[in-house]
Structures are given as C-alpha cells and as structure tokens.
Amino acid sequence: MNPIYQHYLVLKGEQPKKYARDLAALIGISEAELCEARIGVDAVALKRDFPALLKALGAVGETKNITRNAYAVHEHLGEYHNVHIGAHGGLVLNPRALDLRLFVGQWCSAFALQEPTGQGVRHSIQIFDRHGDAVLKVYATEQTSMAAWQTLIADFTDAAATPLVVEPVAAAPLTEAIDATAIDREWRAMTDVHQFFALLKRHQVSRPQAFRAVGEDLAWQTGNDALERLLQMAQQAGNEIMIFVGNRGCTQIFTGRVEKLQPVENWLNIFNPQFTLHLMADQICESWVTRKPTGDGFVTSLELFAADGTQIAQLYGQRTEGTPEQSRWREQIGALRTPGAAA
C-alpha cells in the first residue's frame, strides 16, 4: 500500500471530521496528490478532456456539487443541463438550480473516488487545478443513475495518466502606484459588471485596492458582522438573493430564499433543501459593499475577504438580466451602514 495513503488513513482515524484537503496539508502534499496516491485503492485517474467530462455528466441525473475555497463551502444539488464549455472556460447555466462559472484553463487533473463510509460507498468525481487544489467535486446522490455513472467512469478512466506535477501558487503582480482617479473614472463608465475584471487587470490591482480607490458612493467598507445581518434580513423578508463562492477554477452560485440560517461556533451555515453553505465567519477580515453600473442601473453586492486576500464569498440580490435591482435588497444593503448590535 502506498505510504502516503497509509499516512492518510492514520490521520483520518485520528481526526475523522477533517476534510481531505486538511489531511493532505498535514501530510505535506496537495489534495490532488493525495488522490493520486489512492489510485489502485479507492481512486482512478480520469482523462483530462474536461469539456467532454462535464457534458457526459448530463446523463447521470442529480448530483451534489461542491465548490469551495479555504473559508467557505458551497454545496448544491442539481443536474448538468445547459452546459456551455470550451477549452478555457464555460458555464452550467441553470438559475435557481446548478449554476456554475468554469475557468477550465486552470484545470489540470480529475479523479473518480469510491470511498467506504459508515453509510456505504460514496462515489465522487473530483477536479483539481495545477496547484493541486480542488476546483469542483461532484458526488452521486440517491437520485443519481449509478448505471450511467459507472459507464461514465469506465469511458473516462485513464490507466496511462501522466504523473502529477504540482506547481506552487504564485502571487498575482499588484501595483502600489494606484491611479485612483483613473480607476474611479473607468468604474463609473462601466455598463456591465463583468467589465470590472478587465479594470482590475488593466491597473494590476486587487479588488480591495480598487474599492479603496473609488468614491464612497461606489464602494464602502462595513462591519464584518454584515454577512450574518444581511442573511438574517433576507431570511425574514423572504426575498431571493444570490450567493457566489469560488476559487481559481470554478464559481458556484445559489439563487433563492434563505430558509434555515444556523450559526454554529465560528461557522455560519445555511441549510436549504437543495443548497448548503458553510462559511467561517471569524475569518472575515474585510467586508465591502460595492455598486457597479450596468445598462439596468447600479448593481449592489456585499464582498467578503480573508486576511490573505481570498475572496470568501460575494452576495447579490436576485436579478434577471434587463430588470433593475430589487428595492428590498437595496434597503437591506443600506441598513449595513448602521452598526449592528454585535458591532
């Protein structure tokens, strides 16, 4: 048996509640390398034709999909319909169901796992970037067609997969010579929220750097209790919101009402029938409200960041293209200017 896998089993026995990525870190390897070490035991490598793989998932029916970063875990049930994907990017477009934005150019490896658990065998497909970090995990559920799942695994198994070469993460080049006037001017000239990515790239600034550069009518910092306050307001009012959680390779989006909000110790949790969120509220270091111009008026969001600069999550009011933003959402965001009881 592979010594890495043996080490993993020992750690898992000692710390059964830890995620695989955390156990891999304790071993001193990436999660992708841990999966590679499990080949021949409970894992197989899959062909790296990611567009074909995601399109093939349409045949299996319902799956549970997990996209996460170091501070938030976003889980959504859904099916792989409306998959539009190329060599570098794409999307799975099912608002209020499985809704993904895919940065396939970042993807590097994929594995199928069959993990024994106390509740039976857990089947999953796990996709990783070139740094060995998971970008998307797809789990079979009781509603999944296991015959179609097994056919997919057989079709995509790569018995001759090349060994992984995991690259260290390089920090994005950022400038300290910020042209605040130009950033403010270009921000106000936007007509689509997606133009914001180009603005950041042109000026080589992070999102918080851009927020600090513009006027307070476009971006303002609020208390780090803002997420819990906003979710409480949305739950009480029953208006639909959007919650984005992403990493280098994938962003997963929930659209709907907050049904069950449950803080537990340092975790802020949402438990809906089709959607679950686990977010480490004590790791929120900066909370920003931003307003970006579009052809339908301003779109307002709450953006949350960790101390290392990771964007933990982003929230919007539900909005259909071509319609203005919810007035209720704007009122809820506006209430964040007033300190909460915990602030």
Features from the language model and the residues they span:
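C-terminal functional regions that serve as terminal interaction/effector modules
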Residues: 1-32, 38-40, 238-251, 256-258, ...
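An N-terminus-focused feature that recognizes amino-terminal "leader" regions
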Residues: 1-116, 120, 341-343
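Hydrophobic, ordered structural segments
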Residues: 2, 9-14, 92, 99-199, ...
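Surface-exposed interaction/gating patches
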Residues: 16-23, 34, 46-49, 63-65, ...
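Short, low-complexity cationic-aromatic patches
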Residues: 58, 98-103, 116-123, 235, ...
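Generic short beta-strand
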Residues: 65, 125-126, 243, 302
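Short loop/beta submotifs within extracellular cysteine-rich repeat domains
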Residues: 73, 132-137, 251, 309-313
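DNA replication sliding-clamp ring fold and its partner-interaction surfaces
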Residues: 97-108, 224, 273-287
